[in-house]
Amino acid sequence: METELPKRKANRLPTYDYAQSGAYFITICTRERQQILWADNDLKPAANTDKNVGASIARPQVVAPLSKPGKIVEQCILQIPSHYQGVLVEKYAVMPNHVHLLLLLQSWQDGRAMLAPTATISQIVQQFKGAVTKNLGHSIWQKSFHDHVIRTRYGFEMIWQYIDINPQNWHKDCFYKEPPP
């Protein structure tokens, strides 16, 4: 007697074209949420690293030294636009056990329609994960990724700010896991 395995829930919107122009918030987690991307996972805001955020308001910044895998992840993030015409990495954060990306896909460049279609978000993430794996010699990623299609300017600004302050709120993050003693 064969037992039927449970079917995985589809992570993407079934009728949405993930190659169309737009803004996308992507989160990619490490396997078993291993905290391997920062050199020190218990960081606090550093002295004299306040960032002026306007209206005479300063926000303390966390300066997170990246581990070797974290540095490779950052290099691969910065290379994404060179692999895909019309794809911009607007903002990113390398966290101890996950990565946030704010990607812009544009079908227009310099006021002209681009000849080649833009890759889908899934293809971009697959290439990124593959590049990190190739550079490290082994995979550090969990299967799949989380995505959110950003539909409004307000949503874009909120996610941009979330990514910007995420390192200093690491201990409050939903992906935070208490490190073993």
Model-inferred region functions:
Residues 1-181:
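Short catalytic/metal-binding and nucleic-acid-binding patches
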